UniProtKB/Swiss-Prot annotation:
PANTHER family to which the protein is assigned, alphabetical: 10 KDA HEAT SHOCK PROTEIN, CO-CHAPERONIN GROES
Family: Belongs to the GroES chaperonin family.
Superkingdom as given in the UniProt entry: Bacteria
Subunit structure: Heptamer of 7 subunits arranged in a ring. Interacts with the chaperonin GroEL.
Entry-linked SMART domains: Cpn10
Disulfide bonds: none
Protein's UniProt name: Co-chaperonin GroES
Keywords attached to this entry: Chaperone, Cytoplasm
Pfam families linked to this entry: Cpn10 (PF00166)
Length: 95
């Protein structure tokens, strides 16, 4: 199944979760903190403005991005869980 985000929405694949803490302790289940970065896998056409024009997207497919801990909604695509969020929920692009 393919998903094409609409308007200013972005589909993000979350980065892999850390299996060990900074101190070397192996984390299991709920102890693992979900990373707040990922890779953009699809983008919409841009935000529709009141005057009818479309504001183009700043992010593009393949960008590594940072986002808030509670940003986006989880979406199941095949056997993978992705995040759908608005572009404004993205805090930055990792260079």
């Amino acid at each position: 199944m393919n998903i094409r985000p609409l308007q200013d929405r972005v589909l993000v694949r979350r980065a892999e979760e850390e299996k060990k803490s900074a101190g070397g302790i192996i984390l299991t289940g709920n102890a693992q903190e979900k990373p707040s970065q990922g890779e953009v896998v699809a983008v919409g056409n841009g935000k529709k403005l009141d005057n009818g024009t479309t504001l183009p997207m700043d992010v593009k497919v393949g960008d590594k991005v940072l986002f808030g801990k509670y940003s986006g909604s989880e979406v199941k695509v095949g056997d993978e869980t992705l995040l759908m969020m608005r572009e404004e929920d993205i805090m930055g692009i990792i260079a």
